[in-house]
Design a protein with these regions (language model features):
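Short hydrophobic alpha-helices and adjacent helix-cap/hinge residues
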Residues: 3-6, 29-368
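Bacterial N-terminal signal peptides
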Residues: 13-25
C-alpha cells in the first residue's frame, strides 16, 4: 500500500511537471542587459520619417542580433524649417540635460544633418566627452548661432568633421563628401571655356550647408565668377527667371532644391521646369539631384542606409570594447555621367565619351 501511494505521488508530480512545461516555454526570456548608461539616439526628424525609420530599424536589428546589452533610447529634434535653426542648439541642450548621473549616456548617436549640427554646436562637458557616432551626415557642417538670426542673410563658415572638432569625442561615423574640386574639374573638362558657375541651393539646412562649402571652395578659383541662385531669398519662379537670363559660358552646379523662400516644399517636377527655363545650359550636380533628366553628370556621394553599419560598430565599441577597430568613414563618391549625347540640346564633346576614367550613368527618362 505504501509503495502504491509512493507511485501515485510520483505520478502526480510527473503530470504536474508535464502540464507546467508549456507554460515555462511560453514565458519570455529576458535579454541580458547592463546597468551602464543607455545608448542615446537623437534624430533630426520624427522617427516615423522613412529615412529615419529605415535606419533605426536596421540599427536595432543588427545590435540585437549581435547580442548588444545596452538600452537604446530615441529622442527626436523634430526639425522643420531653416528659419528655426537658432532653436536647434537649445533643443539639443534640453535633450542632453535629461540624461545625468547614472542615466548619463554611454554613447550618443546622431542621425541627420540638423541633429549633428546641433550637437557640435554644444560647448558642454557631456557633448564633448561622451563618445558619439554620426550617420546621415556630410563631411561639411555648420555651427549654429546662439541667438535668433535671419537665415536669409546668414553666411556661416563651413566646418569639416575631420579637422574642426578634435575637442569632441567622435569615435565613429559614416559621412558623405560633397567634392567641389572634382565637380569643377569635371565641368572644365566638358566646357573649357566656362567662365561662370551658377550654384543652386534651397532654403534648407542641407542647401545652406552646401552653399557655405561651395563658397569656401570657390576661393581656389579666382578666375571663375560664382552666381548664387539661393532659395533662401528667392521663389521658384524667381530662380527660374534668373536661369533664363544667365550669360554665355555659364555652367550650373546643382546642389539641392526642395524648399524656396516661401518655406513651401516644391514638387519633384519643378526641376523639369527649371531645366526648360534654359534647356541649353550645361548643368552638373553635386548631390545627384537632377540626374537622369537634367544634369549631364557630376561627382556625387553614393547614398545608402547606414543603420546596420552603426549597429555593428556600436556593438564593437560598447559591448566588445573594441576601441581600435572603429573610426570615421567617408562613404566613397562616384563620377556619374549621362550616357546620352545631345540630350536637351546641350552639346557634349565627343572626345569625353572616349575617356575610360569616366563612369557612365545610363540615360533613363523620368516621368513628369
Amino acid at each position: 500500500l505504501k509503495e502504491m501511494r509512493g507511485l501515485a505521488i510520483i505520478f502526480r508530480f510527473f503530470m504536474l511537471l508535464v502540464l507546467l512545461l508549456p507554460v515555462v516555454a511560453l514565458c519570455p526570456v529576458k535579454a541580458e542587459t547592463t546597468s551602464e548608461g543607455p545608448i542615446l539616439i537623437v534624430t533630426s526628424y520624427n522617427p516615423e520619417t522613412r529615412s529615419i525609420s529605415d535606419n533605426l530599424s536596421a540599427f536595432m536589428d543588427e545590435y540585437r542580433q549581435r547580442g548588444g546589452k545596452y538600452t537604446p533610447i530615441i529622442e527626436s529634434m523634430n526639425c522643420k524649417n531653416l528659419s528655426e535653426a537658432y532653436l536647434w542648439k537649445s533643443r539639443m541642450a534640453s535633450i542632453l540635460g535629461k540624461y545625468k548621473g547614472k542615466n548619463r549616456p554611454s554613447l550618443v548617436i546622431l542621425l541627420g544633418q540638423e541633429a549633428w549640427s546641433a550637437y557640435i554646436s554644444q560647448d558642454t562637458e557631456i557633448a564633448k566627452k561622451t563618445p558619439s557616432i554620426c550617420g546621415m551626415v556630410s563631411v561639411n557642417g555648420l555651427v549654429l548661432p546662439d541667438d535668433s538670426i535671419d537665415t536669409r542673410v546668414w553666411e556661416p563658415e563651413s566646418k569639416n568633421i575631420y579637422t574642426d572638432f578634435s575637442d569632441y569625442n567622435i569615435v565613429a561615423g559614416y559621412v558623405y563628401e560633397y567634392d567641389v574640386d572634382k565637380n569643377i574639374k569635371l565641368m572644365r573638362r566638358f566646357y573649357p571655356d566656362m567662365r561662370r558657375v551658377a550654384f543652386i541651393s534651397d532654403n534648407t539646412y542641407g542647401g545652406l550647408s552646401m552653399q557655405a562649402l561651395v563658397k569656401k571652395e570657390m576661393k581656389k578659383y579666382p578666375d571663375l565668377e560664382t552666381i548664387w541662385l539661393d532659395g533662401r531669398t528667392e521663389t521658384f519662379m524667381e530662380v527660374s527667371e534668373r536661369m533664363r537670363r544667365l550669360p554665355q559660358n555659364t555652367c550650373v552646379l546643382l546642389g539641392t532644391w526642395r524648399v524656396d523662400c516661401t518655406e513651401s516644399y516644391v514638387i519633384g517636377n519643378t526641376t523639369y521646369m527649371l531645366r526648360d527655363a534654359n534647356p541649353t545650359l550645361p548643368v552638373f550636380t553635386i548631390a545627384s539631384v537632377g540626374l537622369g533628366h537634367w544634369a549631364l553628370g557630376g561627382y556625387t556621394p553614393e547614398y545608402h542606409a547606414v543603420g546596420k553599419n552603426i549597429g555593428a560598430v556600436t556593438y564593437d565599441f560598447l559591448d566588445k570594447g573594441d576601441r581600435e577597430g572603429v573610426d570615421l568613414l567617408t562613404i566613397p563618391g562616384n563620377y556619374k555621367i549621362l550616357g546620352h549625347r545631345g540630350c536637351f540640346g546641350v552639346h557634349v564633346p565627343d572626345s569625353l565619351f572616349l575617356d575610360s576614367h569616366i563612369l557612365y550613368y545610363p540615360y533613363q527618362p523620368l516621368e513628369t
